[in-house]
Amino acid sequence: GEIIHTEGAYIHNLDPFWNEYQDNWRYEFNKKHRGDIYPTHGMGPACWALDIHRGDRMKTLIAMDTDAFNGKKLAQKHGEESYLNGDHTTTLIRTEKGKTIEIQHNVVTPRPYNRMYQVEGTEGFANKYPNEGFSIIENLDGEAYVSSEMRDALMAEYQHPITREGSLVETARRVGGHGGMDFIMDYRLIYCLRNGLPLDQDVYDAAEWSCLGELTRVSIE
């Protein structure tokens, strides 16, 4: 099959955390900028799945946002009136090869934390977070994911080589950092550097994922 659509997001109500950032920088940045100002959380996995910069490239973008309904309430708590970032921002991207990416940003509504990692293909679908589920074209139900037994079998068959190292996974869980994810990412970075391998993401990836912040603002305005 062929992957045709991916999704990712940063949806995380930050009400408990606004005051924890030095000099209130995160509130200030949201207050002063429209667009998806934190696209990389979702863009990384979405672009990797579609081989962006490794066979395909992003070509066109359109973004929309809601008004800052809760954002302005947040500003009022700080004794201010202006707040530019919309409560919810959605971005659609089309690639050179006719694939699409959807990215969302939302840090002020009561919606529960969600990274919306989804991969859609011609012969299957995977939903990774917050609820893991898969569907495949063989014996397709159309209204439900595959059974837990088949899901576990698929996860075992396609398990990433890094996570096959049991001791590494256990160390990651013990050290922590976003459930061990931070440790795995640091481990992979150092492994590549030690072994002379190209990094999993390069400066071109970082630049293009990050530029969505400004491009989405331009699209919206």
PLM features: what roles do these ranges have?
Residues D87-T89, H105, R115:
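Residue-level marker for the onset of beta-strands and adjacent loop->beta junctions
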